């Protein structure tokens, strides 16, 4: 059975919600799915004072586990148009896997969130995708089979490069049904692609 890892970092819960939707989509395709998060780098007292969502159910990932999966779908909020340092720090530890070619041929994808419509969604996706390409992975985005990314009747995330959500400057906006549908779609397509490639 196809094994999929949804690997994420979420400070305020928006990416956690998107990760759960990505996982739902992958499960719809018949994959076995694990949802894991990367370690927090912000000290606990600072995270609490900043109202970080610290009660997330997903276990902490270990770098050596990445080789166990057929597909890895990576999500993180943006930090100035790039992936959050927590995710970058985790992926930077994959040098040993890279040196062995342990991730070559695996399927990868990316999803993100920004505070505003033009807050760096696509550049953040590119920073994730660039890492995955260097690992030797085959990238699957959010193709136009998902018609929701063409919507003009509401503010919505979504890009051919990956599922996205818009949080609002104060973080009060939660992922919309359309954005969650995009995440589910991407998860399903990635799992289907991994099944075709890896059986």
UniProtKB/Swiss-Prot annotation:
Note on how the cofactor is bound: Binds 1 FMN per monomer.
Pfam family, one: FMN_red
PROSITE patterns: FLAVODOXIN_LIKE
Swiss-Prot/TrEMBL keywords: Flavoprotein, FMN, NAD, NADP, Nucleotide-binding, Oxidoreductase
Keyword field contains Transcription: no
UniProt binding sites for FMN: 10-15, 78-80, 113-119, 134
SUPFAM superfamilies in UniProt: Flavoproteins
GO CC annotation, single: membrane
GO MF term list: flavin adenine dinucleotide binding; FMN binding; NAD binding; NADH:ubiquinone reductase (non-electrogenic) activity; NADP binding; NADPH dehydrogenase (quinone) activity
Cofactor(s) the protein requires to work: FMN
Domain Flavodoxin-like as annotated: residue spans: 4-190
Disulfides per UniProt: none
Keyword Oxidoreductase: yes
EC number of the protein: 1.6.5.2
Residue positions binding substrate: 98
Binding-site residues, NAD(+): 12
Catalysed conversion reaction: a quinone + NADH + H(+) = a quinol + NAD(+); a quinone + NADPH + H(+) = a quinol + NADP(+)
NCBIfam families assigned to the protein according to its UniProt record, in alphabetical order: flav_wrbA, PRK03767.1
Annotated family: Belongs to the WrbA family.
Name of protein: NAD(P)H dehydrogenase (quinone)
Species per Swiss-Prot/TrEMBL record: Bradyrhizobium sp. (strain ORS 278)
Organism taxonomic ancestry: Bacteria, Pseudomonadati, Pseudomonadota, Alphaproteobacteria, Hyphomicrobiales
């Amino acid at each position: 059975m196809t094994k999929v890892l949804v690997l994420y970092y979420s400070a305020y819960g928006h990416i956690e919600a998107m990760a759960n939707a990505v996982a739902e989509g992958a499960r719809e395709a018949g994959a076995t799915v694990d949802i894991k998060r990367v370690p927090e780098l912000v000290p606990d007292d600072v995270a609490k004072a900043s109202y970080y969502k610290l009660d997330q159910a997903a276990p902490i990932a270990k770098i050596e586990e990445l080789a166990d999966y057929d597909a890895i779908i990576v999500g993180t909020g943006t930090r100035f148009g790039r992936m959050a340092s927590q995710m970058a720090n985790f992926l930077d530890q994959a040098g040993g896997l890279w040196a062995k070619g342990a991730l070559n041929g695996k399927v990868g994808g990316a999803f993100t969130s920004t505070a505003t419509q033009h807050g760096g969604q696509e550049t953040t996706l590119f920073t994730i995708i660039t890492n995955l390409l260097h690992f030797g992975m085959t990238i699957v985005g959010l193709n136009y089979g998902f018609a929701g990314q063409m919507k003009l009747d509401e503010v919505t995330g979504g890009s051919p490069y990956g599922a996205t959500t818009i949080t609002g400057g104060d973080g009060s906006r939660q992922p919309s049904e359309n954005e969650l549908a995009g995440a589910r779609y991407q998860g399903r397509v990635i799992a289907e692609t991994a099944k075709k490639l890896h059986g």
